Amino acid sequence: MFQTSLPLPSNDGENTIEIEVIEKTWKCPTCTPKEQHVLEELQKRTNIRDRNALAAIMGNIKQESGFKAKICEGGAKVPYKQCRYGGYGLIQWTTTNRYNNLGKFCKKYDCDPSTIEGQTRFMINESAFQRYLSEFENAGFSIEQYMVPSYYWLGWGIKGNRTHYAYQYAGKLVWTE
């Protein structure tokens, strides 16, 4: 739930009346705290409001890392600086540039590249995600249709169960204040 206070002019023209605006968001009561964090940040930091778009992103993250931040491709559970090859983290940043940019981002913005919080911040701000963000912000498409920008954002080699996971998330998301 996101709350905002908006000042409105009163009838006498001098005083203002504050009203509270409460925006509804998608919640996942049965999700893990890590999943809930990513879901909340995606809605807070972007204009993604479509259930299927959010579910597609969540399904992709589950396929890539199982929402484990300290995970190196192949399963080694290590901090950021100890992953020497393959992908790392939530979306398995694989290329040298993407991996290094995670570290640079967290150094610049004082976050830890080994945590869900640091990686979520980077993921949302990363140029690869930003390039396809508008496609996720356009509402009304199927999960399969949101898998197209997901593929270009992530560049996965193996599709795996990401679509299946996305449908599971879509079934668990609840529209609430």
What are these regions (language model features)?
Residues 1-12, 16, 99-177:
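Non-catalytic cell-wall polysaccharide-engagement segments
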Residues 51-68:
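Short, functionally critical alpha-helical segments immediately adjacent to catalytic or ligand/cofactor-binding
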Residues 16-37, 41-42, 65-140:
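Peptidoglycan-targeting cell-wall enzymes and recognition modules
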Residues 46-51, 80, 146-151:
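Hydrophobic alpha-helical context, especially transmembrane and signal-peptide helices
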